[in-house]
């Protein structure tokens, strides 16, 4: 979620829907590239991840946030564009490492733990960014000062997870067959992810250009995500004693796919409301992806980073395509 919230740092001539979209696009491309690159090395040598300096990626994020914040204060368009792209790349690389790291550590934990941790993390993230957005808009708090502590806090949590002993068998040796088996178990989820990510990217970009601001387009969805997170946590607490959580998630996914296929036809009614509903649905699906990916990583004793990078990377590609289509559609009078 950090990837999409970096745009609140833009100010002055940089604070336009087009440049906000540019920051998001460059950042998630760098995010995806980092995920694929680290996963490629880890597939050959699982110990690669443990040798990566987490503090370096934290520093990249913080440096990128500062560069993006400074870019809008400059009058020179060429310099501003260079700083925006450079800052977005730095943050994207750091975010890619962070996302993969959480997939790696959660993949070492028993699914009974991750089924609660994942929606709880989603709840805390949505709450944090809603507070940051409202503070920046209504309290005139500097967005940069609100954003900078977050990568440090996340790194501290990652260090705490690194010190834990894995619950089950951990992937310390290379076994391509186990990776293929794990991915095969997620095929339907991956296909659904491609469809939903494309449609979400499409509606998100159309909403941003329609209301003229990424921040405005995100506030209602953040509230919707809070509601979704609370409902998912309630489902998890209920499911521990009453039903199979994985089965419940597999029932929820087709419902979300159908909603995503139908909702764009109601675009003219209210773009912001439609974006909020689709964001809530996508937030639900994002939690399901996290849970199923880390559960598969645990069950098949493979790296959560590698499996997560493949699933997440494909999702990002589909979202990029959706954003591109949405941008082109909004150019049509």
Where do the language-model regions lie?
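Helix-loop boundary and gating motifs at the non-cytosolic
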Residues: 1-33, 188-214, 290-291
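C-terminal transmembrane helical hairpin of 12-TM major facilitator-type secondary transporters
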Residues: 243-286
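Central cavity-lining transmembrane alpha-helices of secondary-active solute carriers
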Residues: 21-45, 226-235
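Glycine-rich segments within core transmembrane alpha-helices of 12-TM secondary carriers
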Residues: 29-32, 111-136, 306-326
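Intracellular juxtamembrane helix-capping segments at the cytosolic ends
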Residues: 95-109, 284-301
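Intracellular loop-helix junctions on the cytosolic face of multi-pass helical membrane proteins
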Residues: 112-116, 126-213, 227-243
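C-terminal ends and interior cores of transmembrane alpha-helices
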Residues: 58-77, 252-268
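Hydrophobic core of transmembrane alpha-helices in multi-pass small-molecule transporters
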Residues: 77-98, 270-287
């Amino acid at each position: 979620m950090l990837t999409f919230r970096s745009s609140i740092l833009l100010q002055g001539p940089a604070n336009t829907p087009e440049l906000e979209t540019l920051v998001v696009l460059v950042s998630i491309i760098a995010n995806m590239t980092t995920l694929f690159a680290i996963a490629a090395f880890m597939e050959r040598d699982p110990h690669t991840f443990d040798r990566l300096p987490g503090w370096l990626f934290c520093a990249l994020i913080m440096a990128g946030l500062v560069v993006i914040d400074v870019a809008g204060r400059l009058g020179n368009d060429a310099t501003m564009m260079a700083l925006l792209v450079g800052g977005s790349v730095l943050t994207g690389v750091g975010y890619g490492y962070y996302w993969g790291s959480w997939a790696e550590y959660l993949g070492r934990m028993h699914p009974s733990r991750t089924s609660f941790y994942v929606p709880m993390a989603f709840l805390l993230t949505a709450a944090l960014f809603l507070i940051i957005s409202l503070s920046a808009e209504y309290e005139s708090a500097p967005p940069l000062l609100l954003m900078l502590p977050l990568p440090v806090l996340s790194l501290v949590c990652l260090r705490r997870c690194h010190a834990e002993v894995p619950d089950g068998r951990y992937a310390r040796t290379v076994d391509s067959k186990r990776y293929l088996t794990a991915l095969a178990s997620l095929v339907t989820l991956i296909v659904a992810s491609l469809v939903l990510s494309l449609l979400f990217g499409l509606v998100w970009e159309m909403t941003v250009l329609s209301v003229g601001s990424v921040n405005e387009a995100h506030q209602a969805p953040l509230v919707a995500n809070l509601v979704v997170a609370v409902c998912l946590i309630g489902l998890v607490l209920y499911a521990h004693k009453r039903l199979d959580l994985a089965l419940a998630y597999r029932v929820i996914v087709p419902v979300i796919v159908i909603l995503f296929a139908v909702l764009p036809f109601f675009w003219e009614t209210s773009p912001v409301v439609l974006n909020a509903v689709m964001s809530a649905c996508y937030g639900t699906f994002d939690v399901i992806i996290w849970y199923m990916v880390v559960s598969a990583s645990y069950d098949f004793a493979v790296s959560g980073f590698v499996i997560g990078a493949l699933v997440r990377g494909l999702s990002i590609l589909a979202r990029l395509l959706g954003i591109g289509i949405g941008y082109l559609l909004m150019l049509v009078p």
